[in-house]
């Protein structure tokens, strides 16, 4: 038992010595591994910002002749996390339009699961990129001398690539459904608009260009992480032995790694 405690203390002591040796080295940022990580960090910001910060509204024009001959605007406001079934229609303040309580009617659909999965994952990626860059730049020797850290980085990179594909695909499908649910189909779904005495016309809906951009950045992130997997793999023990065994046996100097 005592030898085991001694070994644990010794490992903790070595780790503490390495962690205390923080020294900024910007050279890793000039290599593909570090440079692509910076691009991943920036792309993740655009991914969650363009989706999570969206606010929009859809409008319909209503009249019911002969009581109301002038079109009145009824508006439903929606945004992230896109629980459309909680977005009720609102008439102008103090205006009774066709004796209908428009607040009782809402948009159709709940797309919060896809939207929140996408944004939450993008935020986690953002935080991981910060931690990875801190390790690359501040603890370069610790990363290069360790067998576990590059392997963990490699596994995380593969998982992140897959999750970018899954989350972006799910969000792209949800976005398509959101466009349908807030578009011209509103007229066909609203019960008051099915009455003969009430005439409804689709007005407008907020442009969803930023949401389209979020999907683009999602797939861009997937490409960046997938491409960076090779450079992370080169730092692992899975790749290094084949490159370092020959030079060592000949008494030469092993080739430099990606960092």
Swiss-Prot record:
PROSITE patterns: MARVEL. Its main location: membrane. The keyword DNA-binding does not apply. Residues 1-33, 138-150, 234-259 are cytoplasmic. Keywords: Cytoplasmic vesicle, Glycoprotein, Membrane, Transmembrane, Transmembrane helix. Residues 28-237 form the MARVEL domain. Residues 55-116, 172-212 are vesicular. Glycans are attached at residues 71, 212. GO terms for cellular component: extracellular exosome; melanosome; membrane; plasma membrane; secretory granule; synaptic vesicle membrane. It is found in: Cytoplasmic vesicle membrane; Melanosome. It is a multi-pass membrane protein. The chain crosses the membrane at residues 34-54, 117-137, 151-171, 213-233. The keyword Membrane applies. It comes from the Eukaryota. InterPro entries: Marvel, Synaptophysin/porin. One of its GO terms (biological process) is chemical synaptic transmission. Belongs to the synaptophysin/synaptobrevin family. This is Synaptophysin-like protein 1.
